[in-house]
Curated annotation (Swiss-Prot):
Its EC number is 2.7.8.7. This is Holo-[acyl-carrier-protein] synthase. Its cofactor is Mg(2+). Belongs to the P-Pant transferase superfamily. AcpS family.
Length: 133
């Protein structure tokens, strides 16, 4: 059963300006170490960061909190499964909120799709409660 849906659209140029203006102060405040390492290796660095930013916003919306109620930027990180498919790894307040959404006898499954087509980056998140039986 679907317990949360979120989407976000961001202008890559906005992230590009934040990177130019604030550099590591911005990246260390918003992104996990895994995300920073991956994005910093990309040729289209700003687009990579923008997709991850959009994914965090979409995830926060799917959790039903936005970036409030104990959910912080670095509590949500984009990670890739062994086959390369992106998903979200949640910690801290985001993980607590996720667990509160999931009914007994179920486990959470987070679906993520991210894309970019300059000047836009977009993400969709669906949180599903899957029966453990």
């Amino acid at each position: 059963m679907i317990v949360g849906i979120g989407s976000d659209l961001i202008d890559i140029r906005r992230v590009e300006k934040a990177l130019e203006r604030h550099g590591e102060r911005f990246t260390h405040r918003v992104f996990t170490e895994v995300e920073r390492v991956k994005s910093d290796r990309r040729r289209m660095r700003a687009a990579s960061y923008a997709k991850r930013f959009a994914a965090k916003e979409a995830c926060a919306k799917a959790l039903g909190t936005g970036l409030a109620q104990g959910v912080f930027w670095r509590d949500m990180g984009v990670v890739n499964l062994p086959g390369g498919k992106p998903t979200m790894h949640l910690t801290g307040g985001a993980a607590e909120r996720l667990n509160a959404l999931i009914p007994a006898g179920h486990r959470p499954l987070i679906h993520l799709t991210i894309t970019d087509d300059f000047p836009l980056a977009q993400a969709f998140v669906i949180i599903e409660a899957v029966s453990v039986e």
